[in-house]
Amino acid sequence: MNHKLFCVHFLLLILSVCYIQGQDAGGEPAPAEGVAPAPAEGGAPAPAPAEGEAPAPAEGGAPAPAPAEGAEPAPADGGAPAPAPAEGGAPAPAPAEGGAPAPAPAEGGAPAPAEGGAPAPAPAEGEAPAPAPAEGEAPAPAPAEGEAPAPAEGEAPAPAPAEVEAPAPAPAEGEAPAPAPAEGEAPAPAPAEGEAPAPAPAEGEAPAPAPAPAEGEAPAPAPAEGEAPAPAPAEGEAPAPAPAEGEAPAPAPAEGEAPAPAPAEGEAPAPAPAEGEAPAPAPAEGEAPAPAEGEAPAPAPAEGEAPAPAPAEGGAPSPAEGGAPAAAPAEGGAPAPAPAPVEVGPKTEDCKGDPFKRTDCGYPGITEGQCKAKGCCFDSSIVGVKWCFFPRTARAQCLFSPGDREDCGYSSITPMECMKRGCCFDASITGVKWCFHQK
């Protein structure tokens, strides 16, 4: 088409040159450019052309060539020529009959849409307008509904989904598409069949972060490489406590089983059962826990008796039935000191004296412990004298004849019990009172 137009214009140019040369040879001055030729002598002047029409050709001149099909008409006399369309672009539509020509688009503005075509969508507020296509390029096609727009020149294209990865499922009708994950983050896992998908964050909001740990608690540790992440707690349940440093995490309960209760504060956690053993059943409410391996079980209370209350933390155990209660510590002070142990036997000062004036308090072969248990003195350092003998206080107060003795105890009373009563004790004479006082 362009080749034909070029040939026609070239032929017209040759004819015009030949015509001008012929006029110059005939001696007739050529009319000025843009001026209509003078009418012949005695002839009527040529009518002026209507507005918007091309002027009639001069007599003998070649008529102005009609524009080719699809080409733009020549501009009116004194009018600005219509801008040529970009190479490869569609020509501007001709104005309707009697209508004003379409104004040229402002510099940098989008071209007017073709007749019958939908106008290009206006850019959103704050967005840059779509760039005009370069000369010789076709305009970029509008993206299909639901597809991402093509990247601008100089920008990196959106990354294609990795090979082996499944494409993201298309959102259901009426739902917003899932946001693309940030660079370096793993895509969110697809919900299991039958489960509701996680709600997408509102536009302009950051994705919901993981729940922060309670005040004073350590954050949940990240799972080690190759381990599965800890399951999220059910709605309304407290998260499982993180294991102490160096301890193994508690095993997850089997499917259908209830998780093991967390130990109370200050208690040791229950030991995990050995591999292959069944876990010990939890004690019923109100029952005592089972004893640890190697410990003796606590004696069960007799039927009808109330179980003994456990002592308070740091408190002293309650006394046995029938025993004397322990002395309570003084108010606000340190606990009362324990009573000094009662020294068995007389004091050392009571055992001094003339060895040859000792009164026998025992029998041949009596041991030191047996002698002191009777409240007597024992001294085996001197040979030939009494080793077990009465102390001086006993000689002064308890050397009574058997007929002067008054019973002060009971059968099989010990020397300690007798001395606590303030009585004398003498078991050296058989058949008389051993614990006595003077009549």
UniProtKB/Swiss-Prot annotation:
Keywords: Disulfide bond, Growth factor, Repeat, Secreted, Signal
Gene3D superfamilies on file: Spasmolytic Protein, domain 1
Region (33 X approximate repeats of G-G(0,1)-[EV](0,1)-A-P-[A-P](1,3)-A-E): 26-343
Gene Ontology terms: cellular component: extracellular space
Disulphide bridges: 351-377, 361-376, 371-388, 398-424, 408-423, 418-435
Domain P-type: 349-392, 396-439
Residue stretches of biased makeup (Low complexity): 26-345
Keyword Disulfide bond: yes
Species: Xenopus laevis
CDD domains for this protein: Trefoil
GO molecular function: growth factor activity
Chain segments carrying region Disordered: 25-351
Function per UniProt: May act as a growth factor in the germinal layer of the epidermis. May also be involved in growth of regenerating glands and in protection of the skin from the external environment.
A GO biological process held by the record: maintenance of gastrointestinal epithelium
Domain of life: Eukaryota
Residue stretches of each Sequence repeat: 26-33, 34-41, 42-51, 52-59, 60-69, 70-77, 78-87, 88-97, 98-107, 108-115, 116-125, 126-135, 136-145, 146-153, 154-163, 164-173, 174-183, 184-193, 194-203, 204-215, 216-225, 226-235, 236-245, 246-255, 256-265, 266-275, 276-285, 286-293, 294-303, 304-313, 314-321, 322-331, 332-343
Identification of the protein by name: Skin secretory protein xP2
Major site of localization recorded for this protein: secreted
Cellular localisation: Secreted
Signal peptide: 1-22
Pfam families in alphabetical order: Trefoil
Organ and tissue specificity: Skin.
